[in-house]
Amino acid sequence: MKGLFLRIITALALLFWAIDMVFPWQFLRHTEENHYAAIQSRGALYVGTINNQISYFTNNDGERGFEYELAKAFADSLGVELEMKTFDNQEQLFDELDKHNIDLAAAHILYHPKNAERFQIGPAYHSASWQLAYRKNENRPKNLGNVKKDIYISNNLALEETLKELQKQYPQLTWKRNQTLTQEELLLQLAEGKIPYVIANSIDIAAMQQIKPELAIAFDITDEANVHWYLPNKSYHDLQTALLNFMNNAEETGLLDNLKEKYLGHISQFDYVDTRSYMNAIENTLPQYSPLFEKYQGELDWRLLAAVAYQESHWDPHATSPTGVRGIMMLTKNTAQHMKISDRTNPEQSIKAGSEYLHWLISQLPESIEKEEKIWFALVAYNIGLGHLIDARRLTQNLGGNPDNWLDVKKNLPLLAEKRYYSQLKYGYARGYEAYQYVENIRRYMNSIVNYHRVQENQIINDNASNESAVKNLEEIKENKD
């Protein structure tokens, strides 16, 4: 009997050892001391986020988004892979964080004392506020006391705590917390007139306005608050230290500024009339030309090429300017000859030539400029000429900036129109402020196309899922009757 007992103990020990070799993190992940070690052991960082046009989304180019790129850089700094896990709302994120199913939550989450008590928080990297959104052309409430209809919020208990505090000042204040729809889906319902008000993150509202100009902001519900990543309450200090060092480095190297420029820089500019006209053109005009943009995109994103064409001509193949540039890409005679096309008003010829010219401009730029940023420099050259771009880079260097960094060069473009600067430059005066706005508009137009199609695809997926669910319910009802 004793021998049998020893054999059982030995067998169990070997079994646990084998499991530990294959799945060591299953034992490590739940302890404070070993959270960091668990990440290293499994070779992957699990990051929870929310699928929207700022934090995280996927398209034909793969995974994208502010939080994705920042999390990818953090995972790289740890020497592990990144695995993004998407959820519908903040409470789902936090539940998974509580269960240690994710290592951190990253979704532009605003600071709230309730969350800080429940979790560890990383360094602040941005700020935002809660705002009341309503539908344009409806009555705009001046404060919460004027709100007479339902207010909708996504599943966010911290926001609900804020509203409970405000309810002391506005006793009639009521709201509906939707536990199934995302904040973005609530804003879409608001834009379509299905619900009267939504309280949402100011970043998400500004982003949605770029494709749903019907959305308007009534007022801020709260002051601006810091945005943080959140970690499980019991996270070993090695992970917290690694995150702190990473965020400090991201600030110093310009990574954070570059990501803010890429994903947030364009959303602060909003013009209702321009955006409404543009969305109408995306729906009704772009489908005529998108096959040509895709055909001649080359190394570019076809949606960027389309955005350039809209900025140039509003997708009018017969557009003509007082200076003589013509066609959907608004080419000069010299450029048309250089690109060997005969008819600038022919959409296919114009798009082909415009794309080839942009590729040529990119090829003229030094290798010291990062590949992803070259297009913005090339667009300046497309607008005001390569010589003036060279001047802008030289001026940036003279002023102590980095001539290879788009953010540094961008802020100095308006100086090309000031005599004290252009008088010292080789190519002289240029309307650099127009080039600055030119690139900003194109970035905004491109992102709007990307997100318009993303929202359309999501709605199709949701509609199909609803239809499948309805069919399943009908089948179950039929079976029950039978």
Curated annotation (Swiss-Prot):
InterPro entries: Lysozyme-like_dom_sf (IPR023346), MltF (IPR023703), Solute-binding_3/MltF_N (IPR001638), Transglyc_AS (IPR000189), Transglycosylase_SLT_dom_1 (IPR008258)
Domain of life of the source: Bacteria
Catalyzed chemical reaction(s): Exolytic cleavage of the (1->4)-beta-glycosidic linkage between N-acetylmuramic acid (MurNAc) and N-acetylglucosamine (GlcNAc) residues in peptidoglycan, from either the reducing or the non-reducing ends of the peptidoglycan chains, with concomitant formation of a 1,6-anhydrobond in the MurNAc residue
Region annotation LT domain: where it falls in the sequence: 268-482
UniProt-annotated location(s): Cell outer membrane
Region annotation (Non-LT domain) ranges: 14-267
This protein's GO CC annotations: cell outer membrane
Molecular function as annotated in GO: peptidoglycan lytic transglycosylase activity
NCBIfam families in the record: PRK10859.1 (NF008112)
Domains: entry comment: The N-terminal domain does not have lytic activity and probably modulates enzymatic activity. The C-terminal domain is the catalytic active domain.
Similarity comment: In the N-terminal section; belongs to the bacterial solute-binding protein 3 family. In the C-terminal section; belongs to the transglycosylase Slt family.
Role summary: Murein-degrading enzyme that degrades murein glycan strands and insoluble, high-molecular weight murein sacculi, with the concomitant formation of a 1,6-anhydromuramoyl product. Lytic transglycosylases (LTs) play an integral role in the metabolism of the peptidoglycan (PG) sacculus. Their lytic action creates space within the PG sacculus to allow for its expansion as well as for the insertion of various structures such as secretion systems and flagella.
Identification of the protein by name: Membrane-bound lytic murein transglycosylase F
Organism from which the protein derives: Haemophilus influenzae (strain PittEE)
Organism phylogeny: Bacteria, Pseudomonadati, Pseudomonadota, Gammaproteobacteria, Pasteurellales
Gene that produces this protein: mltF
